[in-house]
């Protein structure tokens, strides 16, 4: 079976936005106009094609990125829907990693919101070119030009409108295409499937000319030949303008900006045209970095059908009918269903049972998958998110994704004995799907703890246990992931010696313990010379310290951000062993930590609260009571925005408190930012409670 769509006509794009900017509705309309859906699914009635998990239908927010294939004007668009809620940024990170381009959707009223800034930063981090779609132009208070300014000021980007609205709110009927200099007006009878191309209305001609001039100037800056033509007063052709927009979009010096109203079926076709005109094909993005596992050298993978297969698993889902689906972005070569593939990250061979192309929640079996495609593999047992799949003879490990550590834990207890076994299996499956979700057993109590990125994240996990796996579970109070660190440098020795008949134990070490920069982790330095401790025992000392650092001396929390230097010691020919040195390392570390001024750290959340002005004083007072540090205060569309760092432990139940303090008019978002030192009076309480 040959490839149906040439590589240069494929677009792998994501739709990224803040909650309620209308992202799912926009994806829906794309599927409707490209002929994949027959009836439009509205988020309001819980029937959107992309939102296919039960809870998403209920909450009206998108949680997992479903990958969908659709076609537009001889091009294949692989659409990845990304969640807009801050607890799910890991999902967004994951999809950014495998996208070639993105459509950022902004609400014409709300503009740039906190989550949009986070998603924008992630897209910058992975170098993803994007276009902006200003949605909801039919809403009261819609203002396209406001959003343009916010993108400049808040996101420090260079938005260049390629179409501007005709009318606004109730009178929004279409757009002016600044490239062709024509008006495009949608008619309501055909649900926006048909539109008329007309002359520009006279009252908008001046504004259109002014914006066209800005567009042409931005395009001319992309190319010397175009610049000369522009400065010489010559007209640029439509083709030249399009080429210039694409160049600027790909090198990220400009962001093409369009508008519409997905809900009212206006502006979606012009958005699709922009996707194929300006966003990159797999062949137009930089080559993907990888490492040759044999030589550890850097290698680059060029997107093409030639060459051995290479792909990245970026998402795992459990499908009720097929079992486990592994979503893979193919970068090079091709693969047939039924063949074997090598997982170079795990060094294991896997057999691919079936290859499925997903159309939101319908699926079609395909025989073969090619470079540039996104496809679900069925039958992989050991492959997890972030693993590389490739050809064994030409192995490569593609750049890994980094997953954040959980900041909040909740104890879960199965209600009955029958739930106990099911719960273990279910939590294992959920942890495979979502790398930012962790499951662990608390040693002292034997309780199962689940960890995640926020309260909503864990709520949804518990909800899925009930719905998908039929496990009834009780949940405990949320617990915060505290950490410990040290503030001063200390040197200590420890001699571990046991001589009680038979073979003894002997390990003797001198270590220096030093604090490191926040967030820099653990470092072990070996400065043993002259063989005072034989080489084979050095890793045992390191291992002893790594085990001991899991339980700090203050309150038994993991110790972070320190450096240990092993600089002296001694050994015994007969009695020394790895075990003895492991114990010596562990004891020396504990003694040194006690003397190194240990302190408790807690997760600090970046909180953004949006409230009407009259509640501002109460909200700030409340954040101060929660030990918050106020960083800035801004205005946005008649509301006050307060930015603060607040300890996570003080934020439980905040949504209820904020709602009652502002009569339901305040909203907030929070995400983990950094670990900060706990004030000593509060640290004392926490330590006593732990030891109590």
UniProtKB/Swiss-Prot annotation:
GO terms for biological process: ribosome disassembly. Residues 8-283 form the tr-type G domain. Disulfide bonds: none annotated. The keyword Ribosomal protein does not apply. InterPro entries: EFG_II, EFG_III, EFG_III/V, EFG_IV, EFG_V, EFG_V-like, EFTu-like_2, G_TR_CS. GTP binds at residues 17-24, 81-85, 135-138. SMART domains: EFG_C (SM00838), EFG_IV (SM00889). One of its GO terms (molecular function) is GTPase activity. It is found in: Cytoplasm. GO terms for cellular component: cytoplasm. Keywords: Cytoplasm, Elongation factor, GTP-binding, Nucleotide-binding, Protein biosynthesis. Its main location: cytoplasm. It comes from the Bacteria. Gene3D superfamilies: 3.30.230.10, 3.30.70.240, Elongation Factor G (Translational Gtpase), domain 3 (3.30.70.870), P-loop containing nucleotide triphosphate hydrolases (3.40.50.300), Translation factors (2.40.30.10). Belongs to the TRAFAC class translation factor GTPase superfamily. Classic translation factor GTPase family. EF-G/EF-2 subfamily. Catalyzes the GTP-dependent ribosomal translocation step during translation elongation. During this step, the ribosome changes from the pre-translocational (PRE) to the post-translocational (POST) state as the newly formed A-site-bound peptidyl-tRNA and P-site-bound deacylated tRNA move to the P and E sites, respectively. Catalyzes the coordinated movement of the two tRNA molecules, the mRNA and conformational changes in the ribosome. This is Elongation factor G. It comes from Helicobacter pylori (strain G27). The gene is fusA.
């Amino acid at each position: 079976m040959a490839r149906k769509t040439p590589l240069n006509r494929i677009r792998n794009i994501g739709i990224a936005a803040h909650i309620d900017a209308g992202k799912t509705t926009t994806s829906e309309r794309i599927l409707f106009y490209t002929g994949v859906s027959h009836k439009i699914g509205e988020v309001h009635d819980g029937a959107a094609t992309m939102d296919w998990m039960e809870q998403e239908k209920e909450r009206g927010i998108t949680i997992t990125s479903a990958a969908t294939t659709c076609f537009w004007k001889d091009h294949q668009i692989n659409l990845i829907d990304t969640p807009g809620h801050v607890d799910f940024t890991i999902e967004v990170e994951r999809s950014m990693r495998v996208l070639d381009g993105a459509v950022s959707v902004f609400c014409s009223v709300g503009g740039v919101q906190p989550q949009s800034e986070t998603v924008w930063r992630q897209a910058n981090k992975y170098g993803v070119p994007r276009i902006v779609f200003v949605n909801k132009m039919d809403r009261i208070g819609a203002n396209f030009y406001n959003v343009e300014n916010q993108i400049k000021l808040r996101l420090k980007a260079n938005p260049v409108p390629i179409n501007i609205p005709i009318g606004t709110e109730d009178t929004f009927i279409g757009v002016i295409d600044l490239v062709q200099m024509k008006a495009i007006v949608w008619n309501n009878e055909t649900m926006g499937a048909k539109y008329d191309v007309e002359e520009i209305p006279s009252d908008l001609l001046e504004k259109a000319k002014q914006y066209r001039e800005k567009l042409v100037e931005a395009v001319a800056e992309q190319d010397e030949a175009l610049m000369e033509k522009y400065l010489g007063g010559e007209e640029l052709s439509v083709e030249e303008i399009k080429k210039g927009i694409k160049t600027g979009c790909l090198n990220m010096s400009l962001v093409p900006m369009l508008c519409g109203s997905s809900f009212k079926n206006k502006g979606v076709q012009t958005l699709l045209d922009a996707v194929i005109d300006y966003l990159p094909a797999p062949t137009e993005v930089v080559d993907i970095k990888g490492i040759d596992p044999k030589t550890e050298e850097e290698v680059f993978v060029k997107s093409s059908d030639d060459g051995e297969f290479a792909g990245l698993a970026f998402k795992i889902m459990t499908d009720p009918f097929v079992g486990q689906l592994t979503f893979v972005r193919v970068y090079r070569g091709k693969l047939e269903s039924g063949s074997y593939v090598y997982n170079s990250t795990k060094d294991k061979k896997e057999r691919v049972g079936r290859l499925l192309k997903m159309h939101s929640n319908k699926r079609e079996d395909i025989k073969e998958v090619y470079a540039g495609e996104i496809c679900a593999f069925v039958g992989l047992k050991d492959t997890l998110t972030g693993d590389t799949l490739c050809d064994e003879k030409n192995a490569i490990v593609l750049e890994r994704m980094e997953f954040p550590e959980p900041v909040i834990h909740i104890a879960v207890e199965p209600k009955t004995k029958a739930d106990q076994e099911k719960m273990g299996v279910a939590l294992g499956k959920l942890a495979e799907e979502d790398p930012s979700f962790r499951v662990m057993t608390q040693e002292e109590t034997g309780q199962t703890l689940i960890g995640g990125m926020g309260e909503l994240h864990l709520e949804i996990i518990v909800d899925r246990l009930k719905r998908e796996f039929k496990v009834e579970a009780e949940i405990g109070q949320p617990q915060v992931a505290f950490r410990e660190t040290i503030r001063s440098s200390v040197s200590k020795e420890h001699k571990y010696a046991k001589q009680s008949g038979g073979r003894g134990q002997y390990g003797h070490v001198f270590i220096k313990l030093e604090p490191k920069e926040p967030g820099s982790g653990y470092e072990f330095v070996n400065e043993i010379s002259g063989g005072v401790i034989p080489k084979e025992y050095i890793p045992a000392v390191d291992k002893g310290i790594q085990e001991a650092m899991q339980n700090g001396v203050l309150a038994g929390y993991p110790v972070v951000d320190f450096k240990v230097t092993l600089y002296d010691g001694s050994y015994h020919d007969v009695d020394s062993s790895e075990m003895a040195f492991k114990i010596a390392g562990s004891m020396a570390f504990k003694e040194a930590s006690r003397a190194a001024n240990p302190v408790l750290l807690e997760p600090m959340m970046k909180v953004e609260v949006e409230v009407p002005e009259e509640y501002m004083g109460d909200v700030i007072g409340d954040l101060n009571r929660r030990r918050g540090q106020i960083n800035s205060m801004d205005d946005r569309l008649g509301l006050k925005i307060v930015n603060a760092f607040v300890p996570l432990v003080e934020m439980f139940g905040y949504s209820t408190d904020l709602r009652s303090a502002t009569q339901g008019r305040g909203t907030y978002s929070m995400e983990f930012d950094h670990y900060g030192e706990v004030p000593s009076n509060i640290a004392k309480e926490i330590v006593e409670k732990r030891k109590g």
